[in-house]
Amino acid sequence: MKITVNRGLDLSLQGSPKESGFYNKIDPEFVSIDLRPFQPLSLKLKVEQGDAVCSGAPIAEYKHFPNTYITSHVSGVVTAIRRGNKRSLLDVIIKKTPGPTSTEYTYDLQTLSRSDLSEIFKENGLFALIKQRPFDIPAIPTQTPRDVFINLADNRPFTPSPEKHLALFSSREEGFYVFVVGVRAIAKLFGLRPHIVFRDRLTLPTQELKTIAHLHTVSGPFPSGSPSIHIHSVAPITNEKEVVFTLSFQDVLTIGHLFLKGRILHEQVTALAGTALKSSLRRYVITTKGASFSSLINLNDISDNDTLISGDPLTGRLCKKEEEPFLGFRDHSISVLHNPTKRELFSFLRIGFNKPTFTKTYLSGFFKKKRTYTNPDTNLHGETRPIIDTDIYDKVMPMRIPVVPLIKAVITKNFDLANELGFLEVCGEDFALPTLIDPSKTEMLTIVKESLIEYAKESGILTPHQD
């Protein structure tokens, strides 16, 4: 199937990494096991400060779903366990042991039963890689998915492409073979043919994949790489009992690497980007998952007025230098943007020849040209205002979902109405563009994300229950 996305926005942000190649690998001294994505679930810590851990060792367990673990991808010593509001777990910091210390496994994918595969996925932290729709939460191991979608079309700003991730291997052929093994493991575990969504320019081993998966291509501007759009186009979710699992290209590489190489894949490709970062420092690097920011960029060169983001500028997590930030669990980029503290002189009279605008507030909005954010920053240009009931949001929402009525239903906790409007098909990140262009400065992304978790808790899916 060919998915064509017409609505959206061409985000050609300045500050992208250089395309000239990779610098040497960066081996950080400290890494983080990020537990923030698992906050919807109750976790039970399996380590304490000062404990020695090896690669593959359990760090935390799903409290209500025993024997499902979040594991360490490195060997070392736990130096800190950081908590947030109400003592919620943020991350576990590990000081790496020098040298190769990977734990070796031996698995024969062909002879393993589905039950054996399930235990391997849960015990080795592979299940923690999977996300679940509806609600966009960590996948629940007791749920049986109707479909599995694998996303190779992610086009968020500054996010490394699948081709970049293949630099982890000695050749493209080896990388794609690891990917095929990962797809085979997923297909066997869930007893179905997963859907793989990619872009035409990516050369996949289609002959091998056609026998085990459904292949779809997608084209169009951001957010055409969103799994929500892929599911909406191929097999929409109509009720909360229709479970769909989603994975990224990197997740499948991690799964395939364990079954093929017998080791946890501990490295990743990371983009260092943003206009507040010196052009000589914008690049792609190969480093350990969960690496510290300080090992990848010199934080002393970052102004206190600049914004550090783990992830992309639209959906990433804001970080502070003094909090010793680390890469997030699913983040493959560090974005550094300017955060202006002074208002422009006569800002209310600015014509805006080269200003980004979607509502034609500036003169640049009347020129038919490729929209480019010449120097993206985090300036809101105003305070929060009453939400405007207009169709501008729908022009950047590719799915047939009315943005303003849905946001109003979610804010008022009218989940029955929200479901009728398509609430079960979306995730918070689908509202990144409506949030970006919103004249009222409403944090739609955060509102939707938190409301999905609240609704998931109300539904009882996050705790064991008898059918």
Curated annotation (Swiss-Prot):
Note the PANTHER family from the entry.
NA(+)-TRANSLOCATING NADH-QUINONE REDUCTASE SUBUNIT A
GO biological process, alphabetically ordered = sodium ion transport
Reactions it catalyzes: a ubiquinone + n Na(+)(in) + NADH + H(+) = a ubiquinol + n Na(+)(out) + NAD(+)
Q: Which Pfam families match?
A: NQRA_2nd, NQRA_N, NQRA_SLBB
Q: What's a single GO MF annotation on this record?
A: oxidoreductase activity, acting on NAD(P)H, quinone or similar compound as acceptor
Assembly and partners are described as: Composed of six subunits; NqrA, NqrB, NqrC, NqrD, NqrE and NqrF.
Enzyme Commission code(s) on record? 7.2.1.1
What name does UniProt use for this protein? Answer: Na(+)-translocating NADH-quinone reductase subunit A
Give the matching NCBIfam families.
nqrA, PRK05352.1-1
Q: Which UniProt keywords apply?
A: Ion transport, NAD, Sodium, Sodium transport, Translocase, Transport, Ubiquinone
Keyword Phosphoprotein in annotation = no
Q: Which family does it belong to?
A: Belongs to the NqrA family.
Q: Which gene encodes it?
A: nqrA
Q: Sum up the protein's function in the record's words.
A: NQR complex catalyzes the reduction of ubiquinone-1 to ubiquinol by two successive reactions, coupled with the transport of Na(+) ions from the cytoplasm to the periplasm. NqrA to NqrE are probably involved in the second step, the conversion of ubisemiquinone to ubiquinol.
Decide whether keyword NAD is in the record. yes
